[in-house]
Amino acid sequence: MAAARKQNTRKRRVKKNIEAGIAHIRSTFNNTIVTITDVHGNAISWSSAGALGFRGSRKSTPFAAQMAAETAAKGSIEHGLKTLEVTVKGPGSGREAAIRALQAAGLEVTAIRDVTPVPHNGCRPPKRRRV
């Protein structure tokens, strides 16, 4: 009586043929997250400095942001992406490095938009650091 073994099936990733997309770069003081979506907002590929193995203060470097953008760009090029609009959010150090890495990966950047949320004097900010 051999037990019926369950076939280990994984859903195959469908190659979408998408020409244009949007790169959402969220650059905080601690990390940089790059998500590439189609024009409707459906994610094609994403990457972050932390997901690539950068830990601690190395996550917030421009080099880590560059690597994250390259990884996300490679994943989106596999789906046929050619042109990008870039939206950048946050005050982090990896903003420009991530945009340059997307261009260097072979994607044509058509527009760069800064969508950093600015409060109309909302929450009290954290106290000033004394080093």
From Swiss-Prot:
Query: Single GO cellular component annotation?
Result: ribosome
Ranges annotated as spanning the membrane? none
Could you list this entry's UniProt keywords, alphabetically sorted: Ribonucleoprotein, Ribosomal protein, RNA-binding, rRNA-binding
Gene Ontology MF term list: rRNA binding; structural constituent of ribosome
**Residue ranges of coiled coil:** none
> What S-S linkages are listed for this chain?
none
GO terms (BP aspect): translation
Question: Which positions make up the signal peptide?
Answer: none
Entry-linked InterPro entries: Ribosomal_uS11, Ribosomal_uS11_bac-type, Ribosomal_uS11_CS, Ribosomal_uS11_sf
Q: What family is this?
A: Belongs to the universal ribosomal protein uS11 family.
Q: What does this protein do?
A: Located on the platform of the 30S subunit, it bridges several disparate RNA helices of the 16S rRNA. Forms part of the Shine-Dalgarno cleft in the 70S ribosome.
What do we know about how this protein assembles, alone or with others? Part of the 30S ribosomal subunit. Interacts with proteins S7 and S18. Binds to IF-3.
The protein in question is named Small ribosomal subunit protein uS11
- The gene behind this protein is rpsK
